[in-house]
Amino acid sequence: MAQEVIKIRGGRTLNGEVNISGAKNSAVAIIPATLLAQGHVKLEGLPQISDVKTLVSLLEDLNIKASLNGMELEVDTTEIQNAALPNNKVESLRASYYMMGAMLGRFKKCVIGLPGGCPLGPRPIDQHIKGFKALGAEIDESSTTSMKIEAKELKGAHIFLDMVSVGATINIMLAAVYATGQTVIENAAKEPEVVDVANFLTSMGANIKGAGTSTIKINGVKELHGSEYQVIPDRIEAGTYMCIAAACGENVILNNIVPKHVETLTAKFSELGVNVDVRDERIRINNNAPYQFVDIKTLVYPGFATDLQQPITPLLFMANGPSFVTDTIYPERFKHVEELKRMGANIEVDEGTATIKPSTLHGAEVYASDLRAGACLIIAGLIAEGVTTIYNVKHIYRGYTDIVEHLKALGADIWTETV
């Protein structure tokens, strides 16, 4: 069966500007949240990625009128109807689990296929289920392909998450906005995307306090009205392009950035010795290799993002000594390592820590196992000698708007082929 691949001839120096898209991890929660509205919602600044299109299609399966035009989505929930959501769409992306919280909040029941997405090792949704049960829901998990969630009534509850989880924090918020009384989420995730979803819900009339802290309080309301809302910029896309610019940029400017959201990466760049100039909503970066070797440990926000440990890895081949990367969030998130070895990388993984030594990369055929691994391989291809061919590019398109076109515009020798 024919498939698209990305090909890169490495060694080009990049120059120019990139406008960063809206945040994927906000958009994939805010789109399901629109079904909580009574009426019309308009979203602006959405990333143009496949996950967004899939979620819009799921809204349409609930008889919601949804019109996606570039970065704008208009939604009309006037004729909404509850329905079992098909497994083939749901299993294509993990963020479909936000339909659970939103549908539970709106209808008090939902039947939904089990969520998919990137295979990153164990990623249970037990904290989501714990939250739903605390609000009064009963969960039927007897099926191997779908889940039934139902509540006679949703009542506010005090919920302590056993681990910090962005998905669980948001999903509980979605279910709790229509619950009777107050819901308190302790040990809540503090990520900017959590704040963005809370701000969107508040713009529709929800009563939410404390988003961005470890304690979020939601006072249930009877109705949410329509709203117009602009999604925040994508800090992971911004971080990825920062890594690209540091790897092979001469003068690259990134626009539409919230500097505070990427300050952990900016600080790590200072350790590495990357030239970074931050101004308001734009960042200018250029390659200043060889870099200093560093240690990186992923943590929950505001720590170093797990989504950036793969994209920053190719930079570490350009350092003057061995670097160490430990992923405490997803210890199995190292499927990119074997692919980098095909390119001649001197890299080993032991018990959740990668040891990365200075290496000269050469072009090879490699496979993107997940979204951020794909970004890592693109950066590796940009600095490698010769031509790199990347397979499984569907993962890359799930999270990056027009990445091939953006890189071409910067001067990269990159193209797609059908093989």
Swiss-Prot record:
Modified residues (2-(S-cysteinyl)pyruvic acid O-phosphothioketal): 118
Classification via InterPro entries: Enolpyruvate_Tfrase_dom (IPR001986), Enolpyruvate_Tfrase_sf (IPR036968), MurA_subfamily (IPR050068), RNA3'P_cycl/enolpyr_Trfase_a/b (IPR013792), UDP_GlcNAc_COvinyl_MurA (IPR005750)
Family under the similarity heading: Belongs to the EPSP synthase family. MurA subfamily.
Protein location: Cytoplasm
UniProt KW keywords: Cell cycle, Cell division, Cell shape, Cell wall biogenesis/degradation, Cytoplasm, Peptidoglycan synthesis, Pyruvate, Transferase
UniProt cross-references to Pfam families, sorted A to Z: EPSP_synthase
Function: Cell wall formation. Adds enolpyruvyl to UDP-N-acetylglucosamine.
Enzymatic reactions: phosphoenolpyruvate + UDP-N-acetyl-alpha-D-glucosamine = UDP-N-acetyl-3-O-(1-carboxyvinyl)-alpha-D-glucosamine + phosphate
UniProt-annotated binding residues for UDP-N-acetyl-alpha-D-glucosamine: 94, 123-127, 307, 329
GO molecular function, one term: UDP-N-acetylglucosamine 1-carboxyvinyltransferase activity
Paired cysteines (S-S): none
An individual GO BP term: UDP-N-acetylgalactosamine biosynthetic process
Residue numbers binding phosphoenolpyruvate: 24-25
Keyword Amino-acid biosynthesis among record annotations: no
Residues annotated as the enzyme's active site: 118 (proton donor)
Annotated EC: 2.5.1.7
Name the UniProt record assigns to this protein: UDP-N-acetylglucosamine 1-carboxyvinyltransferase 2
Metabolic or biological pathway, per its Swiss-Prot or TrEMBL entry: Cell wall biogenesis; peptidoglycan biosynthesis
